[in-house]
Amino acid sequence: MWIQVRTMDGKETHTVNSLSRLTKVQELRKKIEEVFHVEPQLQRLFYRGKQMEDGHTLFDYDVRLNDTIQLLVRQSLALPLSTKERDSELSDSDSGYGVGHSESDKSSTHGEGAAEADDKTVWEDTDLGLYKVNEYVDVRDNIFGAWFEAQVVQVQKRALSEDEPCSSSAVKTSEDDIMYHVKYDDYPEHGVDIVKAKNVRARARTVIPWENLEVGQVVMANYNVDYPRKRGFWYDVEICRKRQTRTARELYGNIRLLNDSQLNNCRIMFVDEVLMIELPKERRPLIASPSQPPPALRNTGKSGPSCRFCKDDENKPCRKCACHVCGGREAPEKQLLCDECDMAFHLYCLKPPLTSVPPEPEWYCPSCRTDSSEVVQAGEKLKESKKKAKMASATSSSRRDWGKGMACVGRTTECTIVPANHFGPIPGVPVGTMWRFRVQVSESGVHRPHVAGIHGRSNDGAYSLVLAGGYEDDVDNGNYFTYTGSGGRDLSGNKRTAGQSSDQKLTNNNRALALNCHSPINEKGAEAEDWRQGKPVRVVRNMKGGKHSKYAPAEGNRYDGIYKVVKYWPERGKSGFLVWRYLLRRDDTEPEPWTREGKDRTRQLGLTMQYPEGYLEALANKEKSRKRPAKALEQGPSSSKTGKSKQKSTGPTLSSPRASKKSKLEPYTLSEQQANLIKEDKGNAKLWDDVLTSLQDGPYQIFLSKVKEAFQCICCQELVFRPVTTVCQHNVCKDCLDRSFRAQVFSCPACRFELDHSSPTRVNQPLQTILNQLFPGYGSGR
């Protein structure tokens, strides 16, 4: 097992090899010291937000193959000065050295004076400014960027400081020196708010008729950022599009927010309530007068009830706008608002109840509160895991290091293009695909279990199996073979394999494989009348089967296609116990990988051995570490007496011809039908141009990965099925887009472009056809 260790600044990354999942953190620190030359006591290791502490293993932190651990180097503490050095330093200061530095320290204020000057800014009342007391204005909020109706209650200006000269230029007050005290009409409970002059303007009150609206005009309109079809706040809007049909009027604009940011191409729903912005000094603002009633608020009677559950019915209990426990509205002074979910809770409804309001500024309800006992602080040990305590490895008395096997490292990716119970080929995995380890076969979805030979369910059938020669009764003839069922072996103590010790039974995986036979299940065995009508089984051959079969690969694992169960029966095996035997025959249109046609196809598709990410780099580092002691022995006096050591090879070495010799890859060519379909898909012409460049540079598998990446649905994060190409040239699954429309969201999931939901969505048939050819059966389970 190997992992990546990267410094916190990201400038240096190294691979650490020869690890196990049972490697202690303190042992990992020693290996990191060899690579980074950092002492263990100066290392701070972080993985997934946790600081790794000594005493734990990589398995405790769930560190997997090729994962990255971050290294933060502690600063080494400076040692205290010796008595002699301290005396010499004191004598230097006494003799006058460093006097200039000490004097400058005495005279320096380090910016404290500037901070005090800002705190001493004095404001005084004034009658200056564009807007006076009691005038009705619009005030822009610093959070939303929306404009709210308010009234000026006080105007202040910045007073002159003692340092400023009392000249005509200094006395002249700019608008930036004016601060307005306002109170909001809609939110009187907020009290008085102090705002700058640039966020205040005369209240908008003139409605612009539809026929007077023009593109490029800046107006004030109502818009809801979260729910575009509902009433929201008032924003400045620059009109970008105007359209009128026989039955509807459509107005689109760019919503202006804070700091010059904006929301583009948003549809304005309330086209009859577009207001003209009152520019300064053009018209006098409205002034509060006893003889005139105050102006009507813009949202009065239009926004509807604030609570959509109880419709603001005071006599109806509600758990949304009232107490979340009892739903009562009484005693509002004894209600607490959660700072996370904004729900209200009575003090006496909590468990346990509270006698008074807590003095803390923030309070969280029991559902939102984080249990501090479950939080692992920096420097603390991990909490005990109940799940890991029940594992066989935790209760075993064996001292064997089981963490070095590739079957224990865990999957880094998972096949999601088809469900786990998928019968038949995996889309995008042709016959002849090779992997070095079983965990890679699991990641591809061809055979998901890491160790088990059969993948299936006793009530559904078997989906795949691995022919690895684990049973002496197996007979492999290439296009057909006799397979031995599972079970009958004592695997207690976390064993991987053992000898036959009891009879096998037609249960679990054995029954699942029997269900693939086209005949009723029978406890005594059965034979299919038409074996081709049976359920397909994906077959993977492992290199360990080479001791019994000439069809096994020389290295790793190889996918050999689809087989069908012809018959199954029980018999006494070579071990003397009852075993279940299965006869499987090949039923695949793709050629066998051991034939000449299969080898030509493998070469045409560019199928080569696939290694885990970082495996070859880790192997190269291992080779270098082996060569170093070998050179030391050759240079020593006893080098001539050393014998030849034989080591078992675990993979391709740098000096082996298998690693150095590169086979010539033939570029994959699309069929004439596929090329015509790509030309017909004009909406995705740019995407196809980028994808087709990979045909010249890499093998068939790279081309398929590029297609997956280019045509991935942004909603379900899978390859698009029944794709809909939008006007903005994004591809979304039809089911995902229909689900979005049912939720009243009519914008593109990728770019928020407003989509036309009045007409039915149409599937891009050319794109769907070519995806079905490249990934046959990928729509299974969708």
Swiss-Prot record:
Its EC number is 2.3.2.27. CDD domains: PHD_UHRF1_2, Ubl_UHRF1. Residues 338-342, 358-360 are annotated as: Histone H3R2me0 binding. This is E3 ubiquitin-protein ligase UHRF1. Phosphorylation at Ser-303 of the linker region decreases the binding to H3K9me3. Phosphorylation at Ser-639 by CDK1 during M phase impairs interaction with USP7, preventing deubiquitination and leading to degradation by the proteasome. The record marks 494 as: Required to discriminate between hemimethylated DNA versus symmetrically methylated DNA. A zinc finger (RING-type) spans 713-752.
